[in-house]
């Protein structure tokens, strides 16, 4: 079976920033927030202080993963130029997103540079109050003034936009706003990351919001579900349950497998992040969609 990892991160230089201040690599795959909290972010053997394209390709090759979608996030720090360079170097292996801070004074200039000058066709916004923009900015609306120029530009050039909005306990969790954007800009493909970050015992919220977002131009990636249900062990039954719920509501054609490595691969073996999604959830044709076809359509067919 061919596989695309639809949600992964490169880290040339660890330069994260969030609600806990700056994040600095300290070696052995670990990084420390300004608050003093230490996180293990890079799987052993794949980088002391970084997670390069070469390390990622080795991880992919060892696990028969053909392609990967390189997304951005505040936790590692924006890696826009490095991602662009690696996509140019390995066009058959990578599709890459760029990101900007919607509060940046020169955001229009940045948008035009990445899209018009460099030809980037994917955007990623880590909105999440936990690890993203709303961790260090006041609450803003995903379809509000701060984002309007971004959505308009995305519509002009038919980009794909990936969004991490955190879980339902956070101010960043705005499925209603995503629905409004999707209806306003039907040519923009939107990927909601982490399957809305479901919480164990709150399946009715997941069902409600999947139904709300069951629109032709919205997809959901399955990245980091084993880590979100942090008390589960392989084969991650809570994650499997959430995926079955999603399949029943939006269908396999709207689901994209992703790992969210490197952090998740430091927690669990990368192969387990692939193999927990199996024939108990999807039939053979559905597996092909979730692991390859959907990501190819949403991300790679723009390149």
Task: Tell what function each PLM region has.
Residues 1-6, 15-62, 66-67, 244-256, ...:
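Mid-to-C-terminal alpha-helical segments outside catalytic/metal-binding sites
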Residues 3-6, 71, 97-98, 124, ...:
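Active-site neighborhood of phospho(di)ester-bond hydrolases with catalytic His/Asp-centered motifs
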Residues 7, 60, 83, 114, ...:
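Conserved, mostly hydrophobic/aromatic
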Residues 7-13, 164, 194:
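Histidine-centered divalent metal-coordination motifs
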Residues 47-49, 72-79, 101-108, 131-135, ...:
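Acidic-and-aromatic substrate-binding clefts and catalytic sites of carbohydrate-active enzymes
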Residues 49-58, 104-115, 205:
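Short, acidic/polar
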Residues 66-67, 75-169, 221-225:
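Active-site gating/metal-coordination segments in enzymes
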Residues 122, 137-256:
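Catalytic pocket-lining loop regions of alpha/beta-barrel enzymes
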């Amino acid at each position: 079976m061919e596989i695309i990892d639809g949600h992964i991160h490169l880290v040339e230089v660890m330069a994260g920033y969030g609600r806990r201040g700056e994040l600095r690599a300290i070696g052995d795959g670990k990084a420390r927030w300004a608050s003093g909290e230490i996180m293990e972010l890079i799987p052993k053997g794949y980088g002391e202080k970084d997670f390069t394209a070469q390390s990622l390709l080795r991880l992919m090759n060892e696990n028969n993963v053909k392609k990967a979608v390189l997304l951005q996030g505040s936790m590692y720090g924006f890696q826009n130029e490095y991602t662009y360079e690696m996509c140019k170097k390995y066009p058959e292996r990578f599709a890459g997103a760029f990101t900007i801070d919607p509060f940046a004074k020169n955001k229009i200039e940045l948008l035009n540079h990445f899209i018009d000058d460099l030809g980037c066709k994917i955007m990623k916004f880590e909105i999440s109050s936990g690890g993203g923009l709303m961790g260090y900015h006041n609450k803003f609306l995903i379809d509000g003034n701060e984002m309007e120029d971004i959505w308009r530009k995305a519509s002009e050039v038919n980009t794909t936009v990936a969004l991490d909005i955190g879980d339902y306990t956070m101010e960043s969790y705005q499925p209603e706003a995503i629905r409004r954007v999707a209806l306003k800009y039907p040519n923009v493909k939107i990927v909601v990351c982490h399957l809305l970050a479901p919480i164990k015992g709150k399946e009715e919220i997941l069902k409600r919001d999947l139904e709300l977002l069951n629109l032709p131009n919205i997809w959901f990636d399955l990245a980091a579900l084993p880590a979100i249900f942090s008390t589960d062990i392989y084969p991650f039954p809570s994650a499997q349950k959430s995926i079955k719920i999603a399949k029943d509501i939006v269908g396999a054609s709207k689901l994209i497998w992703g790992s969210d490595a490197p952090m998740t691969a430091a927690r669990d073996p990368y192969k387990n992040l692939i193999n927990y999604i199996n024939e108990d959830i999807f039939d053979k044709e559905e597996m092909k969609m979730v692991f390859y076809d959907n990501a190819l359509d949403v991300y790679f067919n723009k390149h």
